From Swiss-Prot:
EC number(s) stated in the UniProt entry for this protein: 4.2.1.20
Molecular-function GO terms, alphabetical: tryptophan synthase activity
Cited HAMAP family: Trp_synth_beta (MF_00133)
Reaction(s) catalysed by this chain's protein: (1S,2R)-1-C-(indol-3-yl)glycerol 3-phosphate + L-serine = D-glyceraldehyde 3-phosphate + L-tryptophan + H2O
InterPro entries associated with the record: Trp_synth_b_CS, Trp_synth_beta, Trp_synth_beta/beta-like, TrpB-like_PALP, TrpB-like_PALP_sf
Claim: Thylakoid is one of the keywords in the record: no
Physiological role: The beta subunit is responsible for the synthesis of L-tryptophan from indole and L-serine.
Subunit composition and interactions: Tetramer of two alpha and two beta chains.
This protein's name: Tryptophan synthase beta chain
Residue(s) carrying N6-(pyridoxal phosphate)lysine: K86
Family the entry assigns: Belongs to the TrpB family.
Length: 396
């Protein structure tokens, strides 16, 4: 059977204990077969449509761009069942796991969105589900923890390291290496060991495919730029995939600058990391002078990741995509602005992409441009975090 490319340029690969290689090989073969099976594809597309609610809307911002010559559209992944883009690829991987005869699903989660999406897919498809989550993230995302439990998932707190996403990833991988005969590791982003970055991209590419059709319908042309936030990078690669060959469309990824790139409190490895091996892949990584993984930081739990998917690293290296960053404060401003001006409360992750678009518009208000921001999720999970921050600032 032909195999998928394990690398994107120099990035990617499969840096895992030998015991996991057969499991990854089996997964790759099953994925290639499923991609060529019309019955599998139909089942996946039907679930996206009739269960998850695709296609999602492409919404023109009515008020945010007043007084400028920009048209700004939002790709509304916040309207997807489960509240974020995560549901797309989780349904794909869960179907794939079932096809492979697996009975259990292991997952990791940061903001809890991937955990919720995994829990709902497992409930729907009759699979047992256990989710590893950093103890710190469990504290800041309690509504999502309860959602997972409601849908029958077991949530396992991780107290090691920084008690956040990277530690949950390590524990999930450790579990899988002991249980892969009966369990599938449902990785939540377009990163990790091959073939995960490719599988996740292919199950997310519907975002960009729909956007292309919708924008041509509404505007008669492709956008000047598509903009998405980047933690591990799955919502961004889902938006970018169908536009990579459209050379006139700029691809812009937005990393979290946290408290500022001049501090240690950020999560921007693409621009401020060094090449390293982490989470089964070779990719830019936040490291200290001894090569140890540095803690990343972002106000948004879902972007709080010290590395980035290998295809993003490659797109950055060859100059096909550009990657900027946005601070906590800029993201919080965009979060409030979208709520006030358009009546849409975005996820803090998505607010980073919106903030970057607003900076582009502000820099050149007279420029005629057509922009699409991937609004990757809704902000229900973040209202308590934002409330506490604004309260502390005396803004409320």
């Amino acid at each position: 059977m032909s195999k998928l490319d394990a690398y994107f340029g120099e990035f990617g690969g499969q840096y895992v204990p030998q015991i996991l290689v057969p499991a990854l090989d089996q997964l790759e073969d099953a994925f290639i077969e499923a991609q060529q099976d019309p019955a599998f594809q139909k089942e996946f597309i039907d679930l996206l449509k009739d269960y998850a609610g695709r296609p999602t809307a492409l919404t023109l911002c009515q008020n945010l761009t007043k007084g400028t010559k920009t048209k700004l559209y939002l790709k509304r992944e916040d309207l997807l069942h489960g509240g974020a883009h995560k549901t797309n690829q989780v349904l794909g991987q869960a179907l794939l796991a079932k096809r492979m005869g697996k009975k259990e699903i292991i997952a990791e989660t940061g903001a809890g969105q991937h955990g919720v999406a995994t829990a709902l897919a497992c409930a729907l498809l009759g699979l047992k589900c256990r989710v590893y989550m950093g103890a710190k993230d469990i504290e800041r995302q309690s509504p999502n923890v309860f959602r997972m439990k409601l849908m029958g998932a077991t949530v396992i707190p991780v107290h090691s390291g920084s008690s956040t996403l990277k530690d949950a990833c390590n524990e999930a991988m450790r579990d899988w290496s002991a249980t892969y005969e009966e369990a599938h590791y449902l990785l939540g982003t377009a990163a990790g060991p091959h073939p995960f970055p490719t599988i996740v991209r292919e199950f997310q590419r519907i975002i960009g495919e729909e956007t292309k059709v919708q924008i041509l319908e509404k505007e008669g042309r492709l956008p000047d730029a598509v903009i998405a936030c980047v933690g591990g990078g799955s919502n961004a690669i889902g938006m970018f995939a169908d536009f990579i060959d459209e050379k006139d469309v700029s691809l812009i990824g937005v990393e979290p600058a946290g408290k500022g790139l001049d501090t240690k409190m950020h999560g921007a490895p693409l621009k401020h990391g060094k090449l390293g091996i982490f989470f089964g892949m070779k990719a830019p990584l936040m490291q200290d002078e001894h090569g140890q993984v540095e803690e990343s930081y972002s106000v948004s739990a879902g972007l709080d990741f010290p590395s980035v998917g290998p295809q993003h690293a490659h797109l950055n290296a060859i100059g096909r995509a550009e990657y900027g960053s946005v601070t906590d404060d800029e993201a919080l401003d965009a979060f409030q602005l979208l709520a006030r001006k358009e009546g849409i409360i975005p996820a803090l992750e998505s607010a980073h992409a919106l903030a970057y678009a607003l900076k582009m518009i502000e820099a050149e208000p007279e420029k005629e441009q057509l922009l699409v921001v991937n609004l990757s999720g809704r902000g229900d999970k973040d209202i308590f975090t934002v409330h506490d921050i604004l309260d502390a600032k005396g803004v409320l």
